[in-house]
């Protein structure tokens, strides 16, 4: 595989990053590692070698091979990539999201201890001493439990274990506002499925913009075939000689949304990274935005 990779020492342009409210430099597109199983290490190595600097994973053996992510990262570090060049984010997944046969922490422990154990497992898997972001994989049903988990994550932040915190799969604006109000360490990131059933999180994204919270999107292409097939997108693909995915990702990037891409195709990896090579006009962004 190495013969097909570009020189590993390549550095991303500063324009390819966005700065979070905690001063963390986040790539404008992130490589997602769910459902890659035994191919995880090779795909992560390939993604980083081609230019990705952001990697998303989770301490959830049900859907992620987190240790494989670590192996892919280490392979790139051996070839010259510094840890400081990478943005690594992982997640604490509550029991409800775990495979009962492969829980990566003591299911009988307190919530705080579950978070701590999961975090330490992530560090071991990823072979790192810190995370750039620790994300709560999904809200807990009970507000008290939610508070316990978030406080445990705050403890990790305050000890220097992670540079910022976030939450995923949180589609209820009032629930998110409550977390934001109660949190000592405010969420810097929210990562949600981006699709029409939630009206593309319009009001939630407005709140995020007001508070300086970075919105990350997943299932961005899979959930939106109608948008990708729309004449508005097709017209822009012809004008810029880009793929439909590139046009949509570029629109999101110019809207300060960081999309995740989980492609296993080298061609698509290169195309996804190339979204920084062109720019839509304000009118074009408005036209794409009307499709949401």
Which role fits each region the language model picked out?
Residues 2-86, 90, 223:
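N-terminal binding-site loop/beta-alpha segment at the start of enzyme catalytic domains
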Residues 20-21, 46-49, 70-83, 87, ...:
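Acidic (Asp/Glu)-rich catalytic clusters
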Residues 27-39, 100-113, 142-143:
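Active-site mouth loops of central-metabolism enzymes
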Residues 52, 128-131, 162, 187:
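A structural motif
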Residues 83-112, 137:
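Structural motif corresponding to the early beta-alpha repeats
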Residues 123-143:
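Active-site groove signature of glycoside hydrolases
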Residues 138-292:
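Beta/alpha (TIM)-barrel catalytic core signal, keyed to glycine-rich beta->alpha loops juxtaposed to Asp/Glu
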């Amino acid at each position: 595989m190495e013969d097909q990779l570009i020189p590993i020492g390549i550095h991303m342009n500063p324009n390819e990053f966005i700065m979070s409210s905690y001063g963390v430099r986040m790539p404008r597109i992130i490589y997602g590692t769910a459902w890659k199983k035994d191919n995880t290490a090779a795909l992560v190595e390939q993604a980083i070698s081609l230019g990705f600097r952001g990697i998303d994973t989770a301490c959830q053996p049900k859907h992620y091979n987190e240790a494989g992510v670590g192996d892919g990262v280490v392979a790139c570090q051996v070839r010259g990539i510094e840890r400081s060049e990478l943005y690594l984010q992982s997640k604490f997944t509550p029991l409800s999201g775990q495979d009962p046969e492969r829980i990566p922490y003591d299911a009988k422990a307190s919530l705080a201890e579950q978070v701590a154990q999961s975090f330490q497992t992530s560090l071991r898997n990823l072979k790192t001493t810190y995370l750039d972001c620790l994300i709560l994989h999904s809200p807990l049903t009970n507000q008290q439990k939610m508070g316990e988990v978030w406080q445990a994550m705050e403890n990790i932040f305050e000890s220097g274990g992670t540079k910022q915190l976030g939450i995923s799969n949180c589609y209820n604006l009032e629930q998110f506002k409550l977390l934001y109000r109660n949190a000592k360490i405010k969420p810097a990131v929210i990562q949600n499925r981006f699709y029409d059933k939630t009206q593309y999180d319009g009001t939630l994204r407005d709140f995020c913009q007001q508070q300086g919270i970075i919105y990350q999107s997943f299932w961005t292409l899979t959930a939106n075939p109608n948008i990708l097939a729309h004449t508005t997108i097709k017209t822009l693909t012809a004008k810029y000689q880009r793929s439909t995915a590139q046009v949509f990702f570029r629109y999101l990037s110019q809207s300060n949304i960081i999309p995740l891409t989980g492609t296993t195709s080298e061609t698509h990896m290169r195309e996804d990274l190339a979204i920084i090579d062109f720019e839509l006009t304000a009118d074009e962004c408005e036209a794409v935005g009307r499709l949401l």
